[in-house]
């Protein structure tokens, strides 16, 4: 639904000062726009250059003036130009028409695919759902990815931090999650590109088209909407684009009653942009130069990402940690909101184990017996204990070799290597690259499979049979194939 316009809608003001992306606008007495209202400047400057800028009111200064932050470059903007109060917050298009399209912070399509065919819009600023509307019972969000579902399960309507360097498979993991939620949960996804490189956004879009997540022939069959505010854009755009993406996701949850995946890449850039805007507005900086409203800004975004009785928004947020300092106020504030962390390890990617999710570093608040049940909890902890023991033994193996280990330790190493291989699986979105059909593994099958490995029931099977397969039945079939090839 469109934002309700205030009584000041249509009031015209005059630009009195421009300082970079910040502008002061004077309005008639008694006609000041509200904070967070969008102002529209659309006209020609004295040089004849056409200027079209949307700015958001941030402060009321007195003397009939407001201070606003521009959502696009203010190049060419001069004093004396006319500014129109729209009477409402920035609004973006919502609904099925957004699928397969790329938008900027204002909800304008930037993919050269023509206008968006919808009249449905929603304001980017709105309160979080009331407590009475929330689904408070913790429910595991099944992804079909073994390592995540077993060791660091996602919460439906929860928030997950995704950590990983370049080239370890973040994008492929994101694509697989988008694919799986569409197929298994009938849900859609929204991708918010916040302050990252334009090249990365373009690459992601092309990969989405290649893997079928975006259907170029029929956009309505696409599974994702994209909303980008890249690092070359003013801080106002980077600060608000996360809210634009979230607003699109909320429509799918509240109106279509769907389960939605919201990706934010990168949540740190959202905080960084808020810090820049805060300094431009003349606020006193807080610790490490961040804005004094850091906790409020992050909370305003995170509290809207939740499960309601109608549907859910599960958020996966890439987290950049400046200088690897986890105590920095930006990541530290973000961590307080996360339910799970998925850590991608370069060492696993180097071994060819995909997804390269670190089974020992990844965590989840859902992994407790009261939520996932005793069997799941025991299996996950036994898998982690086996892998931890293998990690401890690796130095001994490197120096003395396997033969110097005790019988028990040799058995542990053998099972740990099978577990490590079994934590890999082929992805649907990678079929075109690997030639292997993707696998979605149900949680019960995952637990049963790892229990069999831990119990020693599969000690006789070769290690290679566990690599890049779905469930245990496929392991047995692959082992038979390996045996027959060896004979032949």
Swiss-Prot record:
It comes from Prochlorococcus marinus (strain MIT 9303). It catalyses: ATP + H2O + 4 H(+)(in) = ADP + phosphate + 5 H(+)(out). The keyword Membrane applies. It is a peripheral membrane protein. Pfam families: ATP-synt_ab, ATP-synt_ab_N, ATP-synt_VA_C. The keyword Thylakoid applies. It is found in: Cellular thylakoid membrane. InterPro entries: AAA+_ATPase, ATP-synt_VA_C, ATP_synth_F1_bsu, ATPase_a/bsu_AS, ATPase_alpha/beta_chains, ATPase_F1/V1/A1_a/bsu_N, ATPase_F1/V1/A1_a/bsu_N_sf, ATPase_F1/V1/A1_a/bsu_nucl-bd. Keywords: ATP synthesis, ATP-binding, CF(1), Hydrogen ion transport, Ion transport, Membrane, Nucleotide-binding, Thylakoid, Translocase, Transport. Belongs to the ATPase alpha/beta chains family. This is ATP synthase subunit beta.
């Amino acid at each position: 639904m469109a934002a309700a316009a205030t009584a000041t809608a249509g009031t015209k003001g005059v630009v009195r000062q421009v300082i970079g992306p910040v502008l002061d606008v004077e309005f008639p007495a008694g006609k000041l726009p509200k904070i967070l209202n969008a102002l529209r400047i659309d006209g020609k400057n004295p040089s004849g250059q056409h200027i079209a800028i949307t700015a958001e009111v941030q402060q009321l200064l007195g003397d009939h003036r407001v201070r606003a932050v521009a959502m696009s470059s203010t190049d060419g903007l001069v004093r004396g130009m006319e500014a129109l109060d729209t009477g409402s917050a920035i609004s973006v298009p919502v609904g099925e028409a957004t699928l397969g399209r790329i938008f900027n912070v204002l909800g304008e399509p930037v993919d050269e695919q023509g206008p968006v065919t919808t009249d449905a819009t929603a304001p980017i600023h709105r309160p979080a759902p009331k407590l009475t509307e929330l689904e408070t019972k913790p429910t595991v969000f099944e992804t079909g990815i073994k390592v995540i579902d077993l060791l660091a399960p996602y919460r439906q309507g929860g928030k997950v931090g995704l950590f990983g360097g370049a080239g370890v498979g973040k994008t492929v993991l994101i694509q697989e999650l988008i694919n799986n939620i569409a197929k298994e949960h009938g849900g859609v996804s929204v991708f918010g590109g916040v302050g990252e490189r334009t090249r990365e956004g373009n690459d992601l879009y092309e990969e989405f088209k290649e893997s079928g997540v975006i259907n170029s022939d029929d956009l309505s069959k696409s599974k994702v909407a994209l909303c980008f505010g890249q690092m070359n854009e003013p801080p106002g755009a980077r600060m608000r684009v996360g809210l634009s993406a979230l607003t699109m996701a909320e429509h799918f949850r509240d109106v279509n009653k769907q389960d939605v995946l919201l990706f934010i890449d990168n949540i740190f850039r959202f905080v960084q942009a808020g810090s820049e805007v805060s300094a431009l507005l003349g606020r006193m900086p807080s610790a490490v130069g961040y804005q004094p409203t850091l906790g409020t800004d992050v909370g305003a975004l995170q509290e809207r990402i939740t499960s309601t009785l109608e549907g859910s928004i599960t958020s996966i947020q890439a987290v950049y940690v400046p200088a690897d300092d986890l105590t920095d106020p930006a990541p530290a504030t973000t961590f307080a909101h996360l339910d799970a962390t998925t850590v991608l390890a370069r060492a696993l990617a180097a071994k060819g184990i995909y997804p390269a999710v670190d089974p020992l570093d990844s965590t989840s608040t859902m992994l407790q017996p009261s939520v996932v049940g005793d069997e799941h909890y025991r299996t996950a902890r036994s898998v982690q204990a086996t892998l931890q023991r293998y990690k401890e033994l690796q130095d001994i193996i490197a120096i003395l070799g396997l033969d110097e280990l005790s019988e028990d330790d040799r058995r542990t190493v053998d099972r740990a290597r099978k577990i490590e291989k079994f934590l890999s699986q082929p992805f649907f979105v990678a079929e075109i690259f690997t030639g292997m059909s993707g696998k979605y593994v149900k949680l019960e099958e995952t637990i049963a499979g790892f229990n069999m490995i831990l119990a020693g029931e599969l000690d006789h099977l070769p290690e290679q049979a566990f690599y890049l397969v779905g469930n245990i039945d496929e392991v047995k079939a692959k082992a038979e194939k390996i045996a027959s090839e060896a004979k032949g």
